[in-house]
Structure formats: structure tokens, C-alpha cells
Amino acid sequence: MLNDMPALTHEQQQLAVERIQALMAEGMSSGAAIAQVARELRAGYTGERVTLRWEEDTEVLETPAARAETDPYDSNPDDD
């Protein structure tokens, strides 16, 4: 979950994407370009702020218990 994120309009999001693409075209890595644009947005943004939450943040992830292997052709598994 990310707190205090700028609530961007579609147009602002598109401008951010174009800025990231321009930085990458100049040779910057995608991660560095995204980080730089994010810093720029946070530094100059004065509008509404929101909290972002991904579905994984709200789900309880459980691993099913491992089941013992059984032989589907063994009519009486206790006699082994």
C-alpha cells in the first residue's frame, strides 16, 4: 500500500508517461526514469492525495497444506 500519492488526472498521467519515455529515449533506465518523474510529481503537486492499495494487500495468501501421495489403484492403503 502506498500512502499520500498524488491523485492525477488522465491527462497528467499521460504527460508523466511521455516524460518517462523521453528520459528513456535519452538513455536513462526505466526504473530511474520512473523514480525521477515520481519525485518531480511529488515535489510540484498541490492537489488531492490518495492511498493506493493493490489486491494482494487485502487478501490473505495461504499455501495449501501438502497432501500425502496416495495410490488411486490401492483399495486398502493401510495394508502397505
From Swiss-Prot:
Residues 58-80 are annotated as: Disordered. Coiled coil: none annotated. It comes from the Bacteria. Pfam families: UPF0181. Belongs to the UPF0181 family. This is UPF0181 protein SG1330. The lineage of its organism: Bacteria, Pseudomonadati, Pseudomonadota, Gammaproteobacteria, Enterobacterales.
